[in-house]
Amino acid sequence: YATLALKGFFEWDELTKLRHVGAMLQGHPDMKGTPGIDMSTGSLGQGISAACGMALAAKLDNKSYRTYTVLGDGEVEEGQVWEAAMFAAHNKLDNLVVIVDQNGLQIDGTVEEVAGIEPLDKKFESFGFEVIKIDGHDFNQIESALEKAKTVKGKPTAILAKTIKGKGVSFMENQVGWHGTAPNKEQYEQATAELQAEIDRLEGNC
């Protein structure tokens, strides 16, 4: 939502109304009510299926655009994800990039405890994907992976991005309880202070 606001899809003030009753911006984005949203979310696993349709449409229409979809590693437990993966490889959708946020946690606990998905790289490879493994917090690695994906021909690409849930906020890092919890005022102030301190460090202001 923040990125869409910065790009001018709606006013920045809309961000202060997140998840308010009747507000434009809800927990699950709505393509019918929110500018800039290509696909509504809700049921896990649907994103990659929609992305496959968009990528196939580009091929059929001889368009050069590329399609990107982001999956959580808990979401990868859904069978629909693997049906879509099989479809993508079968149709040689080399204009499709699947990015998996691998933080090892989901709403019900750890991914491994709920339904283990490893070795995820081997699974995607066996389904016919080019696989790139990266540190999901390293922007240089992210950029390099996206550029490499553009060179892959004849098959889709899966970028497996290893991350830490709640990265940058000490009391949120790797804590499953923060999956859908809103911070109170004190927690919000501490979190923003920690994040600002990291920004200052990276920019050399401290």
Which residues are covered by each model-predicted region?
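Glycine/aspartate-rich loop-and-adjacent alpha/beta segment that forms the canonical ThDP
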Residues: F139-C206
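Histidine/lysine/aspartate-rich catalytic loop segments that bind and position anionic ligands
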Residues: D94-V114, E118-F124
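Generic beta-sheet signal
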Residues: Y65-T69, L96, K155-A161
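Conserved thiamine diphosphate
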Residues: N62-Y65, E112-A145, Q196-C206
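A short alpha/beta connector and helix-capping loop motif
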Residues: E78-N103, A158-L160
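Acidic, glycine-rich active-site loops and adjacent beta-strand->loop/helix elements
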Residues: V21-M24, L71-E78, Q102-Q106, H137-F139, ...
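Short acidic, glycine/serine/threonine-rich loops at helix termini
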Residues: Y1, D30, Q80-W82, D108-E112, ...
